[in-house]
Swiss-Prot record:
Key words, A-Z: Chloroplast, Membrane, Photosynthesis, Photosystem II, Plastid, Reaction center, Thylakoid, Transmembrane, Transmembrane helix
InterPro entries tied to this protein: PSII_PsbL, PSII_PsbL_sf
Protein name per the record: Photosystem II reaction center protein L
Transmembrane segments: 17-37
Lineage: Eukaryota, Viridiplantae, Streptophyta, Embryophyta, Tracheophyta
Family, per entry: Belongs to the PsbL family.
UniProt-annotated location(s): Plastid, Chloroplast thylakoid membrane
Role of this protein: One of the components of the core complex of photosystem II (PSII). PSII is a light-driven water:plastoquinone oxidoreductase that uses light energy to abstract electrons from H(2)O, generating O(2) and a proton gradient subsequently used for ATP formation. It consists of a core antenna complex that captures photons, and an electron transfer chain that converts photonic excitation into a charge separation. This subunit is found at the monomer-monomer interface and is required for correct PSII assembly and/or dimerization.
Membrane topology: Single-pass membrane protein
Subunit structure, interactors included: PSII is composed of 1 copy each of membrane proteins PsbA, PsbB, PsbC, PsbD, PsbE, PsbF, PsbH, PsbI, PsbJ, PsbK, PsbL, PsbM, PsbT, PsbX, PsbY, PsbZ, Psb30/Ycf12, at least 3 peripheral proteins of the oxygen-evolving complex and a large number of cofactors. It forms dimeric complexes.
Pfam family, one: PsbL
A Gene Ontology biological process term: photosynthesis
Protein origin, superkingdom: Eukaryota
Primary localization class, coarse: plastid
């Protein structure tokens, strides 16, 4: 993990993809909870 090359775009892309993944997991968790509670 050398910081000789500033990959700010890659870090920002990974961060946004991580946030989208967490949002998707949350949405799926809500959908599954509603499906199981019905």
């Amino acid at each position: 993990m050398t910081q000789s090359n500033p990959n700010e775009q890659n870090v920002e892309l990974n961060r946004t993809s991580l946030y989208w993944g967490l949002l998707l997991i949350x949405v799926l968790a809500v959908l599954f909870s509603n499906y199981f509670f019905n």
